[in-house]
Curated annotation (Swiss-Prot):
<dbReference type="GO" id="GO:0009789">
    <property type="term" value="P:positive regulation of abscisic acid-activated signaling pathway"/>
</dbReference>
<dbReference type="InterPro" id="IPR044808">
    <property type="entry name" value="ERF_plant"/>
</dbReference>
<keyword id="KW-0010">Activator</keyword>
<comment type="function">
    <text>Probably acts as a transcriptional activator. Binds to the GCC-box pathogenesis-related promoter element. May be involved in the regulation of gene expression by stress factors and by components of stress signal transduction pathways.</text>
</comment>
<feature type="compositionally biased region" description="Low complexity">
    <location>
        <begin position="80"/>
        <end position="101"/>
    </location>
</feature>
<dbReference type="GO" id="GO:0005634">
    <property type="term" value="C:nucleus"/>
</dbReference>
<dbReference type="GO" id="GO:0010186">
    <property type="term" value="P:positive regulation of cellular defense response"/>
</dbReference>
<dbReference type="InterPro" id="IPR036955">
    <property type="entry name" value="AP2/ERF_dom_sf"/>
</dbReference>
<feature type="region of interest" description="Disordered">
    <location>
        <begin position="80"/>
        <end position="103"/>
    </location>
</feature>
<dbReference type="GO" id="GO:0045893">
    <property type="term" value="P:positive regulation of DNA-templated transcription"/>
</dbReference>
<dbReference type="InterPro" id="IPR016177">
    <property type="entry name" value="DNA-bd_dom_sf"/>
</dbReference>
<keyword id="KW-0804">Transcription</keyword>
<dbReference type="GO" id="GO:0043565">
    <property type="term" value="F:sequence-specific DNA binding"/>
</dbReference>
<keyword id="KW-0936">Ethylene signaling pathway</keyword>
<dbReference type="GO" id="GO:0090332">
    <property type="term" value="P:stomatal closure"/>
</dbReference>
<dbReference type="GO" id="GO:0009873">
    <property type="term" value="P:ethylene-activated signaling pathway"/>
</dbReference>
<dbReference type="GO" id="GO:0003700">
    <property type="term" value="F:DNA-binding transcription factor activity"/>
</dbReference>
């Protein structure tokens, strides 16, 4: 596999973690160092930029500030902000660039009690209001 195009740059926009399929779509994948370099499939995308952003999101969630990204300016790595704040900024940029019709929500995992509280809050409007 040719890794000469590290990051943005080489001929006609090669991105890290992105391959062009013969039929014109772009495939994104990343290697998981926690699983001995096992490939993790990220999906097939209409544009190389969408695939590169999917790679960046996976790389940042796996490696944090140590990740080598295609679009590092979309992640506030140098400042002291939390990863959820940095991801919120990149998610909006990624969502606006995506031509996909599906809606994706991402939550930073804190602990089970926070998840349970969020789920309970979501069920409250369905139970009716008591005065």
């Amino acid at each position: 596999m040719d890794q000469g195009g590290r990051g943005v740059g080489a001929e006609h926009g090669k991105y890290r973690g992105v391959r062009r399929r013969p039929w014109g779509k772009y495939a994104a994948e990343i290697r998981d160092s926690r699983k001995h370099g096992e490939r993790v499939w990220l999906g097939t995308f209409d544009t190389a930029e969408e695939a590169a952003r999917a790679y960046d999101q996976a790389a940042y969630s796996m490696r944090g500030q140590a990740a080598i990204l295609n679009f590092p300016h979309e992640y506030n790595m140098g400042s002291g902000v939390s990863s959820s704040t940095a991801m919120a900024g990149s998610s909006s940029a990624s969502a606006s660039a995506s031509s996909s019709s599906r809606q994706v929500f991402e939550f930073e995992y804190l602990d089970d009690s926070v998840l349970e509280e969020l789920l309970e809050e979501g069920e409250k409007p369905n139970k009716g209001k008591k005065k």
